């Protein structure tokens, strides 16, 4: 089982970070790899910049604990059993955001490329989230 974990520290209170990150349908606002994202009936549709469609089901979500878990239900990617968790942890006026996933590649030789792609997408998304929230907090 492949695993991915990316984290970022954000100089803003966790409730401010969660106000942006906690809405699964708005993930396209802060993940550069996505051209668009929408939510309907617990399912999120993500359109990648190259036009590929990924459909995800939100499995669990808690505003109180500031996290959600989702799984891919439809994707052109060569993987299965994909599950991911996005969480915002508070540290006073600062936040620690984690984005983790695990999945099985359709073949072992594809795993390194898939892990690398998700690491890049998660890292770029978290950096964009940080910049967006910190800019809004400073305004």
Residue ranges and their predicted role:
Residues 26-78, 91, 96, 124, ...:
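Glycine-rich portal/gate segments that line the openings of hydrophobic small-molecule binding cavities
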Residues 9-13, 49, 73, 89, ...:
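Solvent-exposed residues in well-ordered beta-strands and their adjoining turns
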Residues 96, 102-139:
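A conserved amphipathic terminal alpha-helix motif
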Residues 1-39, 139:
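Hydrophobic ligand-binding cavity/cleft-lining segments
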Residues 78-85:
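Amphipathic hydrophobic-ligand
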Residues 4-6, 56, 68, 84, ...:
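Hydrophobic residues positioned within well-ordered beta-strands of beta-sheet architectures
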């Amino acid at each position: 089982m492949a695993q991915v974990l990316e984290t970022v520290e954000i100089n803003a209170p966790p409730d401010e970070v969660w106000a942006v990150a906690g809405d699964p349908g708005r993930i396209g606002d802060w993940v550069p790899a996505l051209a668009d994202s929408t939510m309907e009936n617990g399912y999120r549709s993500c359109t990648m910049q190259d036009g590929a469609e990924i459909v995800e089901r939100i499995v669990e979500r808690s505003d109180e604990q500031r996290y959600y878990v989702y799984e891919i239900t439809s994707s052109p990617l060569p993987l299965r059993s994909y599950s991911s968790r996005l969480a915002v942890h508070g540290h006073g006026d600062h936040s620690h955001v984690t984005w983790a996933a695990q999945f099985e590649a359709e073949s072992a030789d594809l795993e390194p490329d898939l892990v690398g792609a998700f690491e890049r997408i998660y890292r770029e998304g978290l950096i964009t989230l940080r910049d967006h929230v910190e800019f809004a907090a400073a305004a």
